[in-house]
């Protein structure tokens, strides 16, 4: 399953957005209002839970300086990655798009597609409001 958020313009430099996303505790500011739990587990890992959903642990998997931050599920039960692509547009601005990639069976994919799309759209909108 491959889902993409709309591309948003951020009134911050590419470096500022990259630095923000490299700190896992900052993801709490990006979470939807339906967030029930958020906990920083260490410098590269955090746990969150949205209303009606199970707890999910995300961790930094890799990054490309200034342009990409990749988070992934810490559990192999639901293998997925969430990539933030950050593109410099000049004038101290950048654009950001989130890309979700997961390996799920067809039934699971049908059940989670809409909630995940809504989730990454909200994260993206909130990045745009930084």
Q: Which role does the model predict for each range below?
A:
Residues 1-39, 45:
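Hydrophobic ligand-binding cavity/cleft-lining segments
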Residues 74-125:
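Beta-strand/loop substructures that line and gate deep hydrophobic ligand-binding cavities in soluble
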Residues 7-11, 47-49, 59, 85:
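Generic structural detector for well-ordered beta-strands
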Residues 29, 38-77:
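Glycine-rich portal/gate segments that line the openings of hydrophobic small-molecule binding cavities
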């Amino acid at each position: 399953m491959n889902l993409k958020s709309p591309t948003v313009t951020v009134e911050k430099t590419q470096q500022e957005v990259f630095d923000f996303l490299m700190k896992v505790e900052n993801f709490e500011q990006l979470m939807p209002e339906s967030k029930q739990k958020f906990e920083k587990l260490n410098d590269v890992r955090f746990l969150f839970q949205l209303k009606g959903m199970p707890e999910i642990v995300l961790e930094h998997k890799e990054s490309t300086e200034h342009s990409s931050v990749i988070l992934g599920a810490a559990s192999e039960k639901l293998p997925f990655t969430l990539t933030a692509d950050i593109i410099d547009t000049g004038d101290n601005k950048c654009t950001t798009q989130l890309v979700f990639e997961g390996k799920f069976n067809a039934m699971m994919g049908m059940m989670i597609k809409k909630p995940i799309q809504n989730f990454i759209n909200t994260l993206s909108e909130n990045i745009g409001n930084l």
